[in-house]
């Protein structure tokens, strides 16, 4: 799982509040903090010409961060509306607090783009004591407006830096962003009409681009496609539950795929050879994606 220094900085700040609340027996602290969290200040930045916000967001999500061995978490794009230019990044992280107490932090951050300007606004930032699996134990403590404002500023600064990466570094995250199956499915789901979705895919061609993702195996069969021995029929299930699963056809000559069991979750790597669209759908819905190892 990926960690970011952003998560750890804010997480440590909230750990102090959660531990203090528990040790002091302040049962109403959560409500008081919620009341203080309503007026957080959004942070803003500029999108340079020739760059787009999504690769910069993915650069935040896939950064290795502080390298702390005491934390574990995941940061992912939970929602994307390409027509509106709005994106939501969600995060869950488990870490030991100052007194050695395991705690979990959940956050949801909205990032919106209007022409060449972007803004970052934290909608949720809360901490609670937890077990080793992240199951909550006790009350959630919502961050103050000050805490959320600090996170907004940290993330906006990080996104701005990522928007000005070298061409080589930017291209790496551009590839990650636009070959992400959740992103591809979101385009079809959120576009107001087919033509807008078609235009997006025309501007962001993904065929022959490298990708890797985790999929749920349905079956492994002999391939009828030329140059490949096996066809693995899979299903990609987006983290955003509002999106439909995507059928994935994975073509390989690797004998190891024979050992893939139905309903098992496996990681596949390869190049996108074709995206198949449902031309009869009201939206530009993806019917399946073909991947070649």
Label every model-predicted segment.
Residues 19-23, 42:
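Boundary at the C-terminal end of the N-terminal hydrophobic targeting segment
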Residues 65-67, 94-105, 239-243, 277:
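Short, cysteine-centered beta-strand-loop-beta hairpins and adjacent loop/turn segments enriched
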Residues 32-71, 136:
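Tryptophan-anchored aromatic micro-motifs
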Residues 101-128, 268-269:
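A short, surface-exposed beta-strand/turn
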Residues 1-4:
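Positively charged n-region of N-terminal signal peptides that target proteins for export
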């Amino acid at each position: 799982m990926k960690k970011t220094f952003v998560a750890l900085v804010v997480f440590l700040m909230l750990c102090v509040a959660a531990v203090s609340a528990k040790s002091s027996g302040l049962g109403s602290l959560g409500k008081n903090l919620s009341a203080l969290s309503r007026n957080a200040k959004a942070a803003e930045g500029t999108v340079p010409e020739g760059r787009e916000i999504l690769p910069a967001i993915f650069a935040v999500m896939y950064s290795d961060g502080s390298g702390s061995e005491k934390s574990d978490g995941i940061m992912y794009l939970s929602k994307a509306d390409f027509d509106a230019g709005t994106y939501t990044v969600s995060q869950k992280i488990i870490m030991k607090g100052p007194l050695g107490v395991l705690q979990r932090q959940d956050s949801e951050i909205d990032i919106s783009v209007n022409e060449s300007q972007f803004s970052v606004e934290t909608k949720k930032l809360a901490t609670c004591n937890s077990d080793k699996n992240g199951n909550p134990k006790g009350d959630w403590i919502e961050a103050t407006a000050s805490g959320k404002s600090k996170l907004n500023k940290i993330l906006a600064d990080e996104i701005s830096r990522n928007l000005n990466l070298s061409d080589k570094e930017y291209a790496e995250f551009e590839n990650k962003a636009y070959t992400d199956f959740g992103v591809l499915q979101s385009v079809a789901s959120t576009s107001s009409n087919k033509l807008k979705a078609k235009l997006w895919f025309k501007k962001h061609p993904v065929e022959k681009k490298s990708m890797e993702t985790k999929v749920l195996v349905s079956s492994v069969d002999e391939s009828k496609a030329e140059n490949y021995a096996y066809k693995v029929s899979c299903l990609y299930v987006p983290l955003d539950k509002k999106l439909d699963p995507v059928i994935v056809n994975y073509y390989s000559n690797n004998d190891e795929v024979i050992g893939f069991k139905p309903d098992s979750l496996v990681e596949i790597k390869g190049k996108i050879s074709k995206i198949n669209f449902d031309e009869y759908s009201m939206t530009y819905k993806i019917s399946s994606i073909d991947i070649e190892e």
